[in-house]
């Protein structure tokens, strides 16, 4: 694993390490069939500095999201609590990837004891990444269910989604995902683990799709019903739909950024000897970059879609360190 990393192959799960090993051996076999060393099968190299930089950016952005939600009481709602959980998962994925790059780079050695220590550290980090991936999936699904309740059970929503209940849900998500992530790494030599991850990904997509088909088909009818109620029912329902659209964007970005990695796993399981599959898997480092980009893009989506969150970001970034400057700008 260390030697393959030294050749520019960054890994993030032990099962990915196996994929990288097999990829290298498959590439060597295929090269003997007419492919050159500089061809498609040469593993795409990405500088460790890129992973570290993306990890730092993601860390700062997602900490800002968490602090903003904690600071602003107007954001103390179930949807934003689930977004906070998603931000923690995003942050852990990126920071773990960046940390793994640093660890492997610093401890890269031919010494057997050093390699054994590196593998152990790598497995711990891989467990964090795997747990965070599962938590991201569960958090997105929780946000989808929350949006479903706000639209179809608007009058009973506050009785259904209480703060205490949301806290229990988030705690259960992280407890279950942590245990699952550790077990996945312990038994990562089994192809069943990869199949399980792939199944969870596509099951999540199927559940999201079914929720959204029902949600958007019936949304107009419920908006009309709420509109005849006294008060600001129509305005509230419009805000709920805006939250559903925000979630749609988040899921779309998640799928775009994670799909290449899961396709990589599918190819690893189904066609590890196929030249086209090997060619696709040779860009593994690029798929890791996409995963880290997802963690960077999500906070930007929160900011663009929520005026309240944007305002809180501005207060944290500008008004605290540069209070005098903010006061001066507000006068003019």
From Swiss-Prot:
Effect on the protein upon substituting residue 316 to S: In OBESITY; shows reduced cAMP response to alpha-MSH; retains normal affinity for the antagonist AGRP
> GO MF annotations for this entry?
melanocortin receptor activity; melanocyte-stimulating hormone receptor activity; neuropeptide binding; ubiquitin protein ligase binding
Tell me the compartments it is located in. Answer: Cell membrane
Q: Where is the lipid attached (S-palmitoyl cysteine)?
A: 318
List GO BP terms, alphabetically: adenylate cyclase-activating G protein-coupled receptor signaling pathway; adenylate cyclase-modulating G protein-coupled receptor signaling pathway; feeding behavior; insulin secretion; positive regulation of bone resorption; regulation of eating behavior; regulation of metabolic process; response to food
What are the binding positions for Ca(2+) in this chain?
100, 122, 126
Function of this protein?
Hormone receptor that acts as a key component of the leptin-melanocortin pathway at the intersection of homeostatic maintenance of energetic state. Plays a role in regulating food intake: activation by a stimulating hormone such as anorexigenic alpha-melanocyte stimulating hormone (alpha-MSH) inhibits appetite, whereas binding to a natural antagonist like Agouti-related protein/AGRP promotes appetite. G-protein-coupled receptor that activates conventional Galphas signaling leading to induction of anorexogenic signaling in the hypothalamus to result in negative energy balance.
Quote the subunit structure annotation: Homodimer; disulfide-linked, also forms higher order oligomers. Interacts with GNAS. Interacts with ATRNL1. Interacts with MGRN1; this interaction competes with GNAS-binding and thus inhibits agonist-induced cAMP production. Interacts with MRAP and MRAP2; these associated factors increase ligand-sensitivity and generation of cAMP.
Protein name per the record: Melanocortin receptor 4
The organism of origin for this protein: Homo sapiens
């Amino acid at each position: 694993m260390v030697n393959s990393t030294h050749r520019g192959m960054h890994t993030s799960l032990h099962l990915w390490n196996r994929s990288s090993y097999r990829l290298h051996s498959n590439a060597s076999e295929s090269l003997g069939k007419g492919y050159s060393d500089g061809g498609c099968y040469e593993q795409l190299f990405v500088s460790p500095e890129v992973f570290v930089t993306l990890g730092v950016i993601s860390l700062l952005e997602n900490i800002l999201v968490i602090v903003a939600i904690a600071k602003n009481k107007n954001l103390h709602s179930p949807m934003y609590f689930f977004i906070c959980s998603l931000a923690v998962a995003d942050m852990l994925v990126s920071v773990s990837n960046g940390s793994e790059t640093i660890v492997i780079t610093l401890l890269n050695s031919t010494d057997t004891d050093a390699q054994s220590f590196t593998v152990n550290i790598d497995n711990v980090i891989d467990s964090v990444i795997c747990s965070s991936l599962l938590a991201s999936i569960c958090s997105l699904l929780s946000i989808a269910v929350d949006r479903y309740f706000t639209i179809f059970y608007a009058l009973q929503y506050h009785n259904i989604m209480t703060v205490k209940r949301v806290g229990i849900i988030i705690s259960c998500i992280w407890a279950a995902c942590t245990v699952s992530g550790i077990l996945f790494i312990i038994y990562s030599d089994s192809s069943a683990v990869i199949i399980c991850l792939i199944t969870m990904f596509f099951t999540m997509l199927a559940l999201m799709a079914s929720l959204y088909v029902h949600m958007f088909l019936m949304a107009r009818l419920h908006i009309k019903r709420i509109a005849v109620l006294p008060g600001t029912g129509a305005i509230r329902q419009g805000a709920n739909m805006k939250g559903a659209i925000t979630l749609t964007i988040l899921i779309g970005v998640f799928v775009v950024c994670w799909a290449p990695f899961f396709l990589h796993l599918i190819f690893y399981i189904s066609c590890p000897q196929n030249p086209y599959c090997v060619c696709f898997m040779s860009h593994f480092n690029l798929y890791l970059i996409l995963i880290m980009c997802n963690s960077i893009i999500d906070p930007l989506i929160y900011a663009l879609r929520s005026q309240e969150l944007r305002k809180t970001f501005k207060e944290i970034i500008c008004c605290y360190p540069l209070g005098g400057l903010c006061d001066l700008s507000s006068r003019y």
